A protein has these predicted regions:
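A short beta-strand-turn-helix
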Residues: 5-25, 46-51
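Conserved helix-turn-beta segment immediately C-terminal to the redox Cys motif
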Residues: 24-25, 34, 38-62, 82-85
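Short, internal strand/loop/helix patches
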Residues: 75-124
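Thiol-/selenol-based redox modules, centered on thioredoxin-like
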Residues: 106, 110-160
């Protein structure tokens, strides 16, 4: 089983978002519109746009588990994205930690970041890089900017 086999719906309710990206490199990011790190949306959009034709898909996962910074409904989250011209897909609102952790995050969180951290997602905007084969190949902390050279090198290694 790969990440592409894990069912998760889009924000609009359309099923099986990940399977529709099978064979592409994914950057999966838990997001929150009211987080101080929400400025990263612009960098994620730039990254998605720059590497879309190379096979990269940025997938945003709205989550309200960190400081209740994503309290909005699906419609409110969609309006937020539209107002900021965010074009990459969003999943349904999802738990990334705890008893109701989505199976996607059960698959992703064992992977260690550069500091050796595994397990629970620490905050909004933690990033997981998934290879075209559907395995996690990178994990980047919440404060790692989408334009960080290390993150960009890891993305380029997967899309080329």
């Amino acid at each position: 089983m790969t990440v592409f086999d894990i069912p998760i719906a889009e924000l609009n309710g359309r099923a099986d978002l990940l399977s529709r990206h099978r064979g592409r490199t994914l950057l999966i990011v838990n997001v929150a519109s009211r987080c101080a790190l929400a400025g990263q949306y612009a960098g994620l959009e730039t990254l998605a746009h720059r590497h879309r034709e190379d096979g990269l898909s940025v997938i945003a996962v709205p989550c309200n588990q960190f400081g209740e910074q994503e309290p909005g409904t699906a419609e409110e989250i969609a309006d937020f994205c539209s107002a900021r011209q965010i074009s990459f897909p969003f999943t349904e609102k999802t738990d990334v930690n705890g008893a109701d952790r989505h199976p996607l995050y059960t698959a992703l969180t064992p992977f260690a970041d550069a500091e050796g951290h595994t397990g629970d997602v620490r905050w909004n905007f933690e990033k997981f890089l998934v290879s075209p084969a559907g395995t996690c190949v990178g994990r980047f902390g919440p404060t790692v900017d989408p334009q960080d050279p290390e993150l960009l090198r890891a993305v380029r290694a997967q899309v080329q």
